[in-house]
A protein has these predicted regions:
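Extracytoplasmic/secreted envelope proteins and their assembly/folding machinery
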Residues: 75, 100, 104, 115-118, ...
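Conserved C-terminal helix/tail region of periplasmic/extracytoplasmic solute-binding proteins
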Residues: 335-389
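Short, low-complexity disordered leader/linker segments with a strong preference
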Residues: 1-54, 372-389
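Pocket-lining segment of extracytoplasmic ligand-binding domains
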Residues: 196-197, 202-299
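Secondary-structure end/capping motifs
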Residues: 258-350
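Sec-exported extracytoplasmic/periplasmic mature domains
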Residues: 73, 77, 83, 104-108, ...
Length: 389
């Protein structure tokens, strides 16, 4: 087994963050409109079962809920399961849409993405048929985090913080999981911001620092970084209103059809990565892995994004991430809810196809191991459990 593709570190510049923003779901739509159906729909040849295979993995160390991907890169669990002579190359996607674009172009074979790009990736089978094969994680405060400017009033409860948003200036990267969450909360609570802005994370950071924004909705690990830098405060999360967020693994149907042996092998390794993530004794090791595969984040902020406890008065939870692996009822509910939102946003033409969800591989693997979904949880740990610098 060979391992290729060192992750090149990049400085956190305006170019980096602008790329993050421009890779929103809109880029998927633009990409789909700009490529030829005949060439894009052509199946990639993956060889015969048992043959060595060259895989390109798109993953997101900048989205905490999908960190089984960065664990996989570091621990190389796949070496135990893939055919001998196979190679694996990891490519960072600053946002899920970049990974989806690569998969639609036939350049990425396995994708670790958030709920919105994961669902959007399945919406144009005439371009390339992409399926969801596993649930990376579900949470209430991974993508769904309300931040306010640091000089905002102190709130005794998340409800108070949410009420304060009425008539305020709020920003999100629109089309993202944060946008879906914010709009759901505003509708449920009859909150009407004076302005609801579509901004990149960099612009949101600058706006909060300069006092030009009252609030924003941001995902982890960026939320923990902004809080630790004193740029913002947490006031509420999905736990405050029972709104979930999630991450999914996607693969092209061509790989599933041609190489079920490889799909099973990768998902066996994924189970190892998920169980490693769930074990609290590995928390510091996972934070170190994340620090080695990202730039612009302290190890402490990365640790906090996955494992750090937050007061319940700020939307904190006892479980930071539930690790379903398989397709639980909660995961299916999120898929349907997010799918409807994307249709309303005109990001996808119709709700998700039933065949776009492929539960059999994870179901068979869980049965073989005597496990049921969810297979684990990433529990919130007190700050003193962080033992790094």
């Amino acid at each position: 087994m060979q391992h290729k593709g060192k992750v090149a570190k990049r400085s956190v510049t305006s170019t980096w963050m602008l790329s993050l923003f421009l890779a929103s779901l809109c880029s998927i739509v633009t990409y789909l409109a700009g490529i030829g159906i005949a060439s894009a729909a052509a199946s990639k040849a993956y060889g015969k079962p048992g043959d060595p295979i060259d895989l390109v993995i798109g993953y997101q160390p900048y989205y905490t809920e999908s960190w089984s991907g960065l664990i996989m890169r570091d621990k190389k669990f796949y070496e135990k399961y893939l055919p001998k002579g196979s190679t694996v190359t990891f490519q960072i996607g600053l946002q899920g849409a970049i990974i989806v674009n690569g998969m639609l172009a036939g350049k990425i074979d396995v994708g670790y993405v958030g709920d919105m790009p994961g669902i959007a990736s399945t919406s144009h089978p005439e371009v390339r048929d992409v399926r969801i094969v596993s649930v990376l994680g579900l949470g209430l405060d991974q993508c769904n985090i309300f931040l306010v400017r640091p000089d905002a009033p102190q709130f005794a409860t998340p409800d108070e913080g949410l009420k304060w948003l009425d008539g305020k200036i709020v920003a999100v990267p629109k089309g993202s999981c944060t946008d879906r969450f914010a709009q759901a909360v505003f509708k449920e609570r009859a909150i009407k911001p004076s302005e609801y802005l579509n901004q990149s994370i960099e612009v949101i950071t600058s706006g909060l620092r300069a006092g030009k924004l009252d609030a924003a909705v941001i995902w982890e690990p960026t939320a923990s970084r902004l809080v630790q830098e004193g740029i913002a405060r947490r006031v509420a999360s999905g736990a405050s209103v029972n709104e979930r967020d999630g991450g999914f693994m996607v693969m092209p149907q061509a790989l599933i059809e041609q190489r079920p042996d490889v799909v099973k092998a990768w998902l066996e390794a994924e189970l190892d990565a998920v169980l490693y993530f769930a074990d609290a004794k590995n928390a510091m090791d996972v934070a170190k892995m994340a620090a080695g595969q990202t730039t612009g984040f302290t190890e402490k902020a990365l640790w906090a994004s996955a494992f750090g406890a937050t007061p319940k008065s700020e939307g904190g939870t006892d479980t930071r991430i539930t690790l379903p692996y398989g397709f639980t009822p909660d995961a299916m509910e999120l898929i349907q809810k997010a799918s409807k939102f994307l249709v309303e946003m005109k990001s996808i033409p119709s709700e998700i196809r039933p065949e776009a969800i492929v539960p059999q591989f994870t179901a068979d693997i869980l049965k073989a191991h005597g496990l049921t979904a969810p297979v684990g949880e990433v529990k919130a740990l007190p700050p003193e459990m962080y033992t790094g610098k």
